[in-house]
Amino acid sequence: MNKITFMGVELEEQGPSDLIVKALGKSIKLMDLETFIDTTGFEKDPIMNDYFWQIMVTKQRTHLSAMLLQCLGYEGEFRVQQQHFKRFLKSNNIHPLELTSSDPDIKNYPTIQDEMKLLKPNVISNRKWLIVEPREFKKVIMKLNTKHGDRIREYYLCLEELLRLYLEYCVYFKEREAKLQITTLEQKLEQMNITMIEMKEEMNLSMEEHADKLDTLVDQNEELKLDVSEANEKLETVTHKLGIAVEDRSPRLEQKPLRERFVLFKRNVKNARFQYYAIRGQSIYVNGRLTLYNERYPNLEIIIDIFCQPNPRNLFLRFKNYVKDDERFNFAGNNVECDITYESIMKEIFEKLNEEKRNV
């Protein structure tokens, strides 16, 4: 089985233990050791915690007070305790520091100051207090042969297991944090892609709306022209004199790109309200618009394509006027809303209106 190893801690491939899972579920932030102890239910020993835990985690020297010597298993009067302990230190080649009442370092040890309050001046002047380095005190614990020695060493073994468990928790926490950062980054990238797509769609829609507004303005202009034309027709009564051919009434331009043209195409876009769109103008303009819309709507289908239409804008306006009361058709600029079942009817109407150009 493959294992992940970090600082001597092996993480099983199947994942963290139930205890680690519990700790990970406690907080999204990395817990300190004290909170981890409370969360995992590690059994605390008040005496052990007060003396031995602090010695293990701090770098401060330790004052071997009467209370501490009792915890180590030394009994009797303090003088006797201290003598026995000094012999123990000497036999194990451990050299403590001895402070007197005149030593300025005494102020760094509250337990010494507390003892001095209970002693007579003559006793204080002759008293010596034993101080040991943290590393030396740990040696004391490992070699201690009093009745409390095994209990103290057992506590240290438990602390070692606790620290290993906490280290394992930290590794899994960092692993989870890294995965969350990757997931968050992926989500941000996905959101950026979605935003870019939405912006592109909005831009396309905006361009189409502007084109529709332009076409609407052109339609309004054409309607004004129609009004003027109708007024002129009332003044002119020469229609009966026109005996010319249709081609003479609407002669073709020699340049094909400049000939007028009318196109109605179907977008073939799913769920689109307006499937049909009209383009009116010179052939060169119509071709340019068709190229643009073919890129936008790959399934575009031309329904009506009339070349040499003398007035394509007029044709579309007459179609709108023809079906204005017909609920089967709706308009928005050059857009036409029509159910596909009525497509053939719409084509027939356009063809009928186009043929009216031949009526004198």
UniProtKB/Swiss-Prot annotation:
<dbReference type="Pfam" id="PF10553">
    <property type="entry name" value="MSV199"/>
</dbReference>
<dbReference type="InterPro" id="IPR018879">
    <property type="entry name" value="MSV199_dom"/>
</dbReference>
<dbReference type="InterPro" id="IPR022549">
    <property type="entry name" value="DUF3627"/>
</dbReference>
<feature type="coiled-coil region">
    <location>
        <begin position="173"/>
        <end position="243"/>
    </location>
</feature>
<dbReference type="Pfam" id="PF12299">
    <property type="entry name" value="DUF3627"/>
</dbReference>
<protein>
    <recommendedName>
        <fullName>Putative MSV199 domain-containing protein 212L</fullName>
    </recommendedName>
</protein>
<keyword id="KW-0175">Coiled coil</keyword>
